[in-house]
């Protein structure tokens, strides 16, 4: 993943491969943040950040012409490749794109050049870096020449496949993130914390984050000067009905996230990468 960002001159195309809700779009955004923080893209002191553009390929599954115009532009070449110049262009669910669209992407990766839609006279250049995601087997669903042009394929595991420590750190990170967003300190009872950890999330990380948000929203209605305190009764009802709660007094034992011992001194972007996928091992050394 580090190689995908830093490989000269314009990085390497990378593909996140995993089930729905595992955080592929999230990881793509973090790759962008890492590239910005490492000054691989963008200019120091610039007034604005380099571009980051997300393309939902499912929107173009039945409209090849619209995709071609959006990607390359017309005679002026002002499509996504131009708008993402100097930044990152993320193709979500690339397998949903017809082969004709994937072939346009392949042609750009070959040379860094492209032509406007129905324009054979003008040739444009871009140094946009490309990231892809898919829930399918790449070798079976992608345009084969394009699949061969993506040297870095990163498997993204489901929550069920992650270790207990990974789940715990992820949960704490999401709770802290929600607390920062609301501008409050967050604490959570041991019962509620263990319920969140033990629950089987069908929609993976997306569902875990939704659970955190809804629980914080419920606790916010009882906010005090000390912040918010999440208890078992703030959890979604479907979660409570599927898990056996422990003794009641444990719901009074609180975990204060500001002093949570698993937190590290690394920046937030690198922490998330380490939690979700072990791609920054050499960066920490």
PLM features: residue spans?
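Walker A/P-loop
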Residues: 14-50
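Conserved catalytic/switch belt of AAA+ P-loop NTPases
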Residues: 100-125, 129
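Pre-Walker A (pre-P-loop) alpha-helix and adjacent loop at the N terminus of AAA/AAA+ ATPase modules
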Residues: 1-14
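Short conserved motifs of the RecA-like P-loop NTPase core
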Residues: 184-200, 227-232
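Conserved AAA+ ATPase "SRH/arginine-finger" region at the nucleotide-binding site
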Residues: 153-167
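Conserved C-terminal helix/linker of AAA+ ATPases
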Residues: 212, 218-249
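C-terminal helical "lid" of AAA+/P-loop NTPase domains
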Residues: 194-197, 206-221
């Amino acid at each position: 993943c580090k190689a995908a960002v830093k490989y000269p001159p314009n990085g390497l195309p990378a593909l996140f491969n995993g089930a729905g809700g595992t955080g592929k779009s999230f990881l793509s955004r973090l790759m962008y943040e890492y590239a910005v923080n490492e000054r691989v893209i963008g200019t120091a002191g610039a007034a604005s950040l380099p571009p980051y553009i997300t393309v939902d390929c499912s929107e173009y599954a039945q409209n090849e012409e619209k995709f071609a115009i959006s990607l390359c532009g017309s005679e002026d070449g002002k499509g996504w490749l131009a708008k993402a110049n100097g930044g990152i262009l993320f193709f979500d669910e690339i397998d949903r794109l017809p082969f004709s669209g994937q072939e346009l992407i392949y042609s750009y990766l070959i040379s860094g050049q492209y032509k406007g839609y129905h324009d054979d006279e003008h040739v444009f250049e871009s140094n946009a870096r490309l990231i892809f995601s898919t829930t399918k087997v790449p070798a079976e669903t992608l345009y084969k020449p394009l699949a061969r042009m993506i040297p870095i394929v990163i498997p993204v595991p489901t929550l069920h496949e992650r270790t207990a420590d990974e789940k715990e750190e992820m949960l704490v990170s999401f709770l802290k993130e929600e607390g920062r967003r609301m501008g409050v300190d967050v604490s959570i009872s041991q019962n509620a914390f263990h319920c969140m950890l033990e629950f089987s999330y069908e929609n993976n990380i997306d569902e875990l984050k939704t659970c955190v948000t809804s629980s914080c929203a419920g606790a916010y209605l009882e906010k005090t000067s000390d912040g918010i305190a999440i208890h078992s009764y703030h959890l979604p009802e479907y979660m409570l009905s599927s898990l056996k709660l422990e003794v009641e007094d444990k719901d009074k034992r609180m975990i204060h996230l500001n002093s949570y011992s698993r937190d590290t001194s690394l920046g937030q972007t690198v922490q998330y990468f380490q939690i979700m996928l072990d791609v920054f091992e050499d960066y920490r050394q």
